UniProtKB/Swiss-Prot annotation:
It is a multi-pass membrane protein. Belongs to the HAK/KUP transporter (TC 2.A.72) family. This is Probable potassium transport system protein Kup 2. It catalyses: K(+)(in) + H(+)(in) = K(+)(out) + H(+)(out).
Amino acid sequence: MTSDVAVPAPETAAANGHGEAHTTAGFGALTLGSIGVVYGDIGTSPLYAFREAVTAASSGTDGLATPAAVLGVLSLILWALIVVVTLKYVVILLRADNNGEGGTLALMALAQRAVGTGGATIVLLGIISGALFYGDAVITPALSVLSAIEGMKDVTLRFEPYIVPLTVIILVGLFAVQSRGTARVAAFFGPIMCVWFAVIAVAAIHPIIAQPQVLFALNPLYAVSFMLHHGIIGFVTLGAVFLAVTGAEALYADLGHFGKRPIQTAWLFIVLPSLALNYLGQGALVLGDPGAIESPFFQLFPQGWIRGAMVVLATAATVIASQAVITGAYSLTRQAIQLGLLPRFEIRHTSEAHSGQIFIPRINQLLLVAVVLLVLLFRSSSALASAYGISVTGTMVVTAMMGFVVIWKVWRWSPLAAAALIAPFLFLDLTFLAANLLKVFEGGWVPLALGALMIILMYTWRRGSRLLFEKSRKLEFPLADLVAMLEKRPPQRVPGTAVFLTSDPLSAPTALMHSLKHYKVLHEKNVILTIETAQTPRIDPAERVRLEQISPTFSKVTLKFGFMESPNVPKALAIARKLGWQFDIMSTSFFLSRRALKPAAHSGMPRWQDRLFISLSRSANDATDYFQIPSGRVVEVGTQVTI
């Protein structure tokens, strides 16, 4: 998911389709930024992935980490990094951008636009993918920070009772500072993660030299042999192996911030080599001492202050990884709101320089509660690891499906060629998903439950909004008929301009009808204002405004925003002024209708879903704030509607 922490020159990244930097300095800054934001999640996987995978592989040998298990698991991890991350994401999906933006909802919008009418399946896939990300956003901070703090017991066992409380304190602190924005600290993310990758790579060199046979794991036949000879245990192990590639979606999700080339360069020349070396180093350590599987990552470092310093560095790296996921949840929520999948939650901008720097209080509160509950419920990274993976594999499956549509419809490949390209990756993703589903009763139910809840919320909001729109259109008066009637028999006029917000430009806005009914007057100039969300991330300012004069008294104004943008009505209307519309904010009143919803006997949805939709509607942020309209110029008209 997109991670809207402050990054170097995001405008440059998004401005030219694939975000290619034009200068060496700009390219270097974007590459460094991508290391800090994009690769935090996958970069901290060595803390637990190898340990959990070898432990699963050794379940048939009384917990003894045999050389066959170690080499087989290593080979699976290395080739998962090559096939899933390098080939699927770095080589293929980074090319499937939506005007420079990546991520599942951007891909959904691109695929939906390509399919045209009848894209309901695409929308459903997008809803599933977005919903599953929230499960990932809850588990990643809990698992990452907990696994880092657990390194304290490798320094001294006296720290063990304080692991969970300290983890909770760090997580509460992390969520508490979100409202202040990340601009000040984000500049350090890249350098800290660069140090992280350098240290974990260097620490692995000595064990590899001591146990050079670990390099046999580079041969994919060891992975194949392990799967063929270990039956169900091998299949279960795949679920743990997948932990090594969680975070791969971030490569695609953050495409708009950094561009294709910086993300590819960082992966191929820094992140992948460092991860491969570290996993090989952990494998070499366990080959020499099978007992080291208890904590192979931290045992790469000498006992004493060096290991203690590594715990501190690991904690910093996991906080950075958590930050990227948290801000990704904010970004996903904004996209979902703009695409009509969630109600208008309050969105605060935490930076004047970067429009992507946002904070959503409601999401922050819900994530904090869920993350802390997870830590208190599972209490160890090994237990939490069982809950991880399902949401990420589900997202990857959906991404592969929508990627097929884009390759077929947008790239204009034949269906057979598109299927031939995507089918191997989809098969691999489905295999990983099946392996992770075996962990449902061990904790995998958590992301499934969270995902199911979000799917219900998104589907209910989308369905309810559509039913409400259709019902309102039947009840409302056609705008063209009303204008013709008012031109023939005009009521008393008052000076100034009235702007009526409506989602249906063909019908007379409810606020206009109530104004005529109760006040018996009409402004000199009346504007029917409609705000549309495009299937592209951003809209060129030159295409933002569409004006249509429908009578001497009435005109239509349509403002179009991308799904990555925060609507700012006054700023957009300033563009309309340049196009010739005489607009003065001080003589303009904005009329909005506020609906009080009541459940109807036959609404088209079950009774419980009616009540859920009404509850979501009440939680929506005020339209005045969401569209950034000056509150002193707003007149709200209340209406009651049954759905």
